[in-house]
Amino acid sequence: MADKPSYFVTTPIYYVNADPHLGTAYSTIIADVQARFCRADGYNVKFLTGMDEHGEKVAEAAAKHGMTPQEWTDSQAPHFKQLWETLEISNDDFIRTTESRQYKAVQYLWERMKESGYLYKGSYDGWYCVPDETYFTETQVEKGDEENGTPGAHLCPDCHRPLERVKEESYFFKLSAFQDKLLKLYDEHPDFVQPDFRMNEVRSFVEGGLNDLSVSRTSFDWGIPVPFDEGHVTYVWFDALLNYMTACGYGVDSDEARAELAYRWPANLHIVGKDIIRFHCVIWPAMLMAIDEALPEHVFAHGFLTVRNAETGAAEKMSKSRGNAIAPQDVIDLLGVEGYRYYFMTDVTPGTDGAISFERMEQVYNADLANSWGNLISRSANMSVKYFDGCAPAKPTNDHAFSNPLADVADGIHDRYAAKMGALDYAGAKDEAMALIHAANHYIEDSEPWALAKDESRADELAFVIYNLLEAIRIAAHLLMPFMPTTSAEALRRISCQDEAASDDLAAACVWGGLAGGAPVEKGDPLFPRLEPRA
């Protein structure tokens, strides 16, 4: 375990009040791409996702379907697991907050919070958003009006749905005591919250003053019991945030669990949506400070997915009423799983809201995958079969006078690519791979292998060209592996490099000249058949 550095990446754990959707899939694919890159780059990766099963919202969803909360959450788990399997998600752990390990960890957290002095008992009287499981003060509440059909209503400032007035006995976490400590954290670690403008939002929120947080509920019972006060259950976010440490062995009294926690914690990267950034960048670090635990290194908040209106060009919120809602299966049906992953990771900027459209999906797929990457693989394999009996030419020696522009493009490509992947600049990382692919396609046109094949005196030059094309494919496949693991592995298999697909030394794999000469090359069907325009 400890022979490699640890890299721990997480998604949020997802509410089970409804099926997984495009947004949850987006968060999960981001984390998966990062996990796959880090495994290839030499890290021992733990990639965690899961389900957030407690809280009033889940209890209401269960009642609506005539089930107990546990029955409802059990019925939902297969939907999440099946979609992640379909989308080639490589998570190492799937945590459910109804598991015994989470109960033990949360109850251990309560005991430590009690010892810390940052916990007190009181009464909460204020506004609560059930869909968002969030408390709001009177000054934060949005007032309804005639224009939006909610005159006199108190609305959630985030989701704009009606709030409930809640009055109940509760335990409070002294969040207000951590204002200065949080601001110091942001000053000393300016990359704690990413992108930069999200850090500015978080800082501004904290500078405005923090209220103590109600962390137990007594008006319903679907939650983890507070161990020292019967009738209180844990506030859903106080429970949910701890899942990241639970999965590393927190709260388990064994040498093995303590070793795992020491190795894995703190997390390197939490991937979250911008709507839950305050929980992860304010409440979560304050909780950890209170119990004297290390803080995660980075929290990356991605934007929302919107739909580009084909007629107006405007970005619109997805909704069934507008008829513009897009489900994951809709995208899979159009692009396939690998095209789905590639589009969302390379054409949608993670840090900002991204307007998507089927038209743009087709454009990206055809331009990058069908016309460029897939075409390079097909043409190079076909020429290997035609001119070299289906084998890679011998690896060139250094005693030739031929220029090699592809080796020049590949020089230093790992470091450039890795820097961009580390910064979650997936479009930039993709551009490194596509630069090599485009250069290889231009190389075919410039070198004209078909003409070289007609001149026996230029046989060495032909072999040199075909070898370089296959070597460019090998390196590009490694760079695209985190985005499209199945087709990238297939590209490697077709040039007899299948053993490299599980490589954990990406830097070495990207060194020019790794392709062994004489190995079989297979043509195969097109990896990315061109899409015809939608009717």
Where in this protein do the model-derived segments appear?
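Structured secondary-structure scaffolds
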Residues: 2-49, 101-105, 155-386, 431-433
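Generic structural concept
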Residues: 370, 374, 407, 411, ...
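A glycine-rich phosphate-binding loop feature that marks nucleotide/adenosyl-phosphate handling sites
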Residues: 127-132, 303-307, 359-360, 393-401, ...
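Cys/His-rich short segments
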Residues: 116-179, 183
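Long, amphipathic alpha-helical stalk/connector segments used for oligomerization, subunit docking
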Residues: 349-352, 356-365, 380-429
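Short, glycine/charge-rich beta-strand/loop segments that flank catalytic centers
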Residues: 93-104, 122-135, 199, 301-306
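Basic, alpha-helical terminal appendages of large translation-related enzymes
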Residues: 1-6, 50, 122-127, 131, ...
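N-terminal Rossmann-like or analogous alpha/beta NTP/dinucleotide-binding catalytic cores
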Residues: 2-120
